[in-house]
Curated annotation (Swiss-Prot):
Family annotation (Pfam families): DPBB_1, Expansin_C
Superkingdom classification of source: Eukaryota
Biological function: May cause loosening and extension of plant cell walls by disrupting non-covalent bonding between cellulose microfibrils and matrix glucans. No enzymatic activity has been found. May be required for rapid internodal elongation in deepwater rice during submergence.
Ranges where the Expansin-like CBD domain occurs: 195-275
Localisation: Secreted, Cell wall; Membrane
Entries under PANTHER family matching the protein: EXPANSIN-A15
Record-given protein name: Expansin-A22
CC per GO annotation: extracellular region; membrane
Stated family: Belongs to the expansin family. Expansin A subfamily.
Principal subcellular localisation of the protein: secreted
Species annotation: Oryza sativa subsp. japonica (Rice)
Residues of the Expansin-like EG45 domain: 70-185
Signal peptide boundaries: 1-24
A GO BP annotation: plant-type cell wall loosening
Length: 280
């Protein structure tokens, strides 16, 4: 049987070579569509999956993030609304005309591209609260950081400095969408006037995003569909003044919560009503 050994060894070598070539080809294809990196460690965040997307990040709002208040999502005072200093304005590519308001992202400085400007082993989780508009007077790679199609985060300065060195000004980052963790229940703030009820929805956990919303007054048993007006604001053109209000809210995962009579009949425009219900 000894003469058969050279053939067996040759067959084994060819087989191993084919497997290695196939694995290398698969690896090259994967690299073309995703960025693979070791998940940075963090004392406050859970370990992230190994697949991240590339972007860049700058900062604004000052050392106390006071300049980030307000914004295109309509959250107003980010401190009182529970968003604090862990927030960011998104470029056009990420903002999605306001539909991304409330979404949470885990971000790390990309040490492979700029090790000298990164704080190693740290991630920060932010909530999308604002829009970073394009600057068509400047090129996308020199000042027009938020110009389409660039994915870009203009982060609150305290959040940015968790992952980057201040002198850099702009850093390459890797990011991924993550579930939002919130304290307490979903909150509703009613603005507008008698025939234009504008409802701001805040403190939304899990996806952070609202897919659809309905309202029902106590004078009816019918749910009335609401329309997203801007940012995290939804409106109804029905006359609901003086009625108890219920809201039916569906998030982007398809989970629906009914907030029955969350608003009492004596409500006033400008008031906020906190529920005990939260998406899970």
């Amino acid at each position: 049987m000894a003469p058969a050994r050279p053939f067996a060894l040759l067959f084994l070598a060819v087989t191993v070579g084919f497997v290695l070539l196939t694995a290398a080809d698969d690896s090259a294809n994967a690299t073309a569509t995703t960025t693979t990196a070791m998940a940075p460690s963090s004392s406050t965040d859970d370990a992230a999956p190994p697949v991240w997307l590339k972007a860049h990040a700058t900062f604004y709002g000052g050392a106390d993030a006071s300049g980030t208040m307000g914004g295109a999502c309509g959250y107003g005072d980010l401190y009182s609304q529970g968003y604090g200093t862990r927030n960011a304005a998104l470029s056009t590519a990420l903002f999605n005309d306001g539909a991304s308001c409330g979404q949470c992202y885990k971000i790390a400085c990309d040490r492979k591209r700029a090790p000298q400007w990164c704080r190693p082993g740290v991630t920060v989780t932010i909530t999308a609260t604002n829009f970073c508009p394009p600057n068509w007077d400047l090129p996308s790679d020199n000042g027009g950081w938020c110009n389409p199609p660039r994915p870009h985060f203009d982060m609150a300065q305290p959040a940015w400095e968790k992952i980057g060195i201040y002198r850099a000004g702009i850093i390459p980052v890797i990011y991924q969408r993550v579930p939002c963790v919130k304290k307490g229940g979903v909150r509703f703030t009613i603005n507008g006037h008698d025939y234009f009820n504008l409802v701001l929805v805040t403190n939304v956990a899990t996806t952070g995003l609202i897919k659809s919303m309905d309202v029902m007054g106590s004078n009816s048993t019918d749910w009335l569909p609401m329309v997203r007006n801007w940012g995290a604001n939804w409106h109804s053109l029905s006359y609901l003044t003086g009625q108890m209000l219920s809201f039916r809210v569906t998030n982007m995962d398809g989970q629906t919560l009914v907030f029955r009579n969350i608003v009492p009949s004596g409500w006033k425009f400008g008031q906020t009503f906190a529920s005990k219900l939260q998406f899970k």
